[in-house]
């Protein structure tokens, strides 16, 4: 009878070790879930960014308005019939 009880105790301790410390333990599963949630959030942000970039590429391929806007904003270009005015503030003055 003692050896049966001892065997059951050893078996219980072995299972508890596996549950709390071993591979696939509660702590490891919790950490993997946290990592998975962080990755899902990052993927969602990247999906939004990719959708915006895809829309911009489509707009650049199909219309001249997007190209003109980008040339004005990033390259400072103007049309031939336009006059460019640059307003400069006084030194030390913040806009």
UniProtKB/Swiss-Prot annotation:
The keyword Cell division applies. It is a single-pass type II membrane protein. Part of a complex composed of FtsB, FtsL and FtsQ. Keywords: Cell cycle, Cell division, Cell inner membrane, Cell membrane, Coiled coil, Membrane, Transmembrane, Transmembrane helix. Its main location: membrane. Belongs to the FtsB family. One of its GO terms (cellular component) is cell division site. This is Cell division protein FtsB. It is found in: Cell inner membrane. Essential cell division protein. May link together the upstream cell division proteins, which are predominantly cytoplasmic, with the downstream cell division proteins, which are predominantly periplasmic. Residues 26-73 form a coiled coil. InterPro entries: Cell_div_FtsB, FtsL/DivIC. GO terms for biological process: FtsZ-dependent cytokinesis. Residues 1-3 are cytoplasmic. HAMAP family: FtsB (MF_00599). The chain crosses the membrane at residues 4-21. Residues 22-95 are periplasmic.
């Amino acid at each position: 009878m003692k050896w049966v009880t001892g065997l059951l105790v050893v078996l219980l301790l072995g299972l508890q070790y596996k549950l709390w410390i071993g591979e696939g333990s509660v702590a490891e599963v919790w950490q993997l879930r946290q990592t998975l949630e962080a990755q899902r959030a990052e993927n969602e942000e990247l999906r939004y960014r990719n959708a915006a970039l895809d829309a911009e590429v489509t707009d650049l391929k199909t219309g001249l308005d997007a190209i003109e806007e980008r040339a004005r904003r990033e390259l400072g270009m103007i049309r031939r019939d336009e006059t460019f005015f640059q307003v400069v503030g006084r030194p030390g003055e913040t806009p």
